[in-house]
Each structure stands twice: as structure tokens, then as C-alpha cells.
Amino acid sequence: MADGDSGSERGGGGPGSFQPAPRGGGGPGGEQETQELASKRLDIQNKRFYLDVKQNAKGRFLKIAEVGAGGSKSRLTLSMAVAAEFRDSLGDFIEHYAQLGPSSPEQLAAGAEEGGGPRRALKSEFLVRENRKYYLDLKENQRGRFLRIRQTVNRGGGGFGGGPGPGGLQSGQTIALPAQGLIEFRDALAKLIDDYGGEDDELAGGPGGGAGGPGGGLYGELPEGTSITVDSKRFFFDVGCNKYGVFLRVSEVKPSYRNAITVPFKAWGKFGGAFCRYADEMKEIQERQRDKLYERRGGGSGGGDESEGEEVDED
């Protein structure tokens, strides 16, 4: 199904409507076509946003479309794993936006002198997954504050949503989400992820997930992703499956950068053993260092006690 054929963009449903779609095959060759599983429409200020969960032979993914007042459209494509990370990032932007005070007249005047364009970003993050990058910038202009989301695609094969063939280079796509609608948008996204983001099809790499197929359908169930926060860093653990087997993607995220490694399932035991061994060794090292510190601190006072005791015995 082409992007323009999205059920929600064809006008189905009113503002805030939720439309689950039939999940059956689409006739001959239906397994190779894109199926629409659900649609959600949001009206925020003078814009319409459509969130469509779709599925094709490569897996399940999310299409986000922005339709402006003049009918112009911009679209982003996210795998369900990236959509979950995007949902978490939206939570960070919502918290940051809530802490911002109103813009001063001087700031708005400065923006007007610069041609009314957006000032520097109030907060920025980016996500990287395979050949796609997503840049998130909370910005401000005379019309207010908004979250600009830009997607770029590097050279390589077509992604979840199709697009140019192998070796093609897609131009960047950008949507601008008014800050007042961040919570509503995040909640709608979270509902779609909860309903469609953790099933076999998305993890198995294709509809139906047949046993032993190239999409890795032997694994009908995989562990859920999780994350931990340490100081200013967040670590995401996402289990996935492709034609090569099951893997764990570990992503390290800071405000200024993001890095990730992929660990195949057959190496998990070795990685886990190495982590446990280093944790035990560091615990022993820390205990030895504490013992030495206590000895140095208590050595002088202990010696003084013994001398005082000897003097008492002599008396």
C-alpha cells in the first residue's frame, strides 16, 4: 500500500479516532503487500497528525504523517523498536517543556529580527537505528514552541516502509509537533505500541512468522526490552530477531550522543559471564581497598591503646 493510501489519510475517522484494521491477507500476493493494522488521528492546533501501524514482509512499523492547513504532507517511518525509544524520548521532552518559563518579550523580539525563524534548540536528542537517524529538537519562534522531528536515511536497502530500491538515498523528512500537543501525541503513540508493538510479527520480521522462515519465526516470543539510568546516561536493551537469529542491541544514550552494539544470542552467556566476573573482581578490589584504609586509620589509635594498657599492668 502506498503512503498516500493510508486509511486514516483517506479521511477515515474524526479527530482522536482509533481504527483497528483487518489483519488478513490482501488477496493474491498479499504477504508482500503492506497491511494497515491500526490508525490514529490527532488534531493539534491547525495541523492533523496520523499514526498508522503497518506491516509488510519485512516487519511491523509505524508511519507518522503531518498534514498542514494547506494540505502539505510530511511523513516519518519508524520500526516498532524505534517507536518505543521515541515514546521514551517524548517523555523527556515533556518534562523539559513543563519546566520552561514563558518566553520573554526580548527573546521574541530577537526572533522577529532574525526573520521569525526558530531560535536555537531548547533541547535536542537523536536516535540512530540501522540506516536511519532521527533528530529531535525542541525549538521556539513567534508562533510558539514546537518539537521538530527530522528523519534521514543513509544509503542502503529499502527500510520497513519500502521507498527507494537498494542503494537509493531518501531525502530527509521533517514534521513539527506543537509543544502543547506533546502529551496527547505521546499517549496515542504509547497506546499503539502497547497494542501492536510486542507481538510475534514485529519481532519475527514478517507477517505470520512461520516456523523456520527467513524472518526467524521459530521464536514466537522474545524478552521485552528494558532500560536503566546511570547518572546522565541511559542504557537500552532491546531483543530482536532477523534472518541471522536472535540478538540483543545495547544502546548507550547521553544528551550529546548515542552509541549501540549488537550481541548475537550465542554470545550472551559469555557476555554475562564476563560482566559477572568483573563485578565480582571489582567488589573484591573495593573491599581490599576499604580494609587497607581502615587499617591505616586504625593503626595509630590501636597502638596507643596497647601502650596505655601496658602502663596500667605495670602499675
From Swiss-Prot:
Any idea which residues bear N6-acetyllysine here? K270
Give the Phosphothreonine positions (modified residues): T34
Q: Which stretches does UniProt call biased (Basic and acidic residues)?
A: 288-298
Q: Which residues carry this modification: Omega-N-methylarginine?
A: R23, R155, R297
Q: In which tissues is it expressed?
A: Expressed in muscle cells and in the liver.
> What role does this protein play?
Transcriptional regulator which can act as an activator or a repressor. Represses the transcription of ACTA2 in fibroblasts and smooth muscle cells via its ability to interact with the purine-rich strand of a MCAT- containing element in the 5' flanking region of the gene. Represses the transcription of MYOCD, capable of repressing all isoforms of MYOCD but the magnitude of the repressive effects is most notable for the SMC- specific isoforms.
**Gene3D superfamilies recorded:** 3.10.450.700, 3.30.2450.30
One GO term describing the cellular component: nucleus
Provenance organism: Rattus norvegicus
Segments of skewed composition (Gly residues): 205-219
UniProt-recorded name of the protein: Transcriptional regulator protein Pur-beta
Q: Where is this region: DNA-binding?
A: 28-254
Its subunit composition reads:
Homodimer, heterodimer with PURA and heterotrimer with PURA and YBX1/Y-box protein 1. Interacts with MYOCD and SRF.
Instruction: List modified residues, type Phosphoserine.
Output: S6, S8, S104, S301, S307
User: Which GO annotations describe the biological process of this protein?
Assistant: negative regulation of DNA-templated transcription; negative regulation of transcription by RNA polymerase II; positive regulation of transcription by RNA polymerase II; regulation of transcription by RNA polymerase II
Q: Where are the transmembrane segments?
A: none
Keyword terms of this UniProt record: Acetylation, Activator, DNA-binding, Methylation, Nucleus, Phosphoprotein, Repressor, Transcription, Transcription regulation
**GO molecular function per UniProt:** DNA-binding transcription factor activity; DNA-binding transcription factor activity, RNA polymerase II-specific; DNA-binding transcription factor binding; DNA-binding transcription repressor activity, RNA polymerase II-specific; double-stranded DNA binding; mRNA binding; mRNA regulatory element binding translation repressor activity; purine-rich negative regulatory element binding
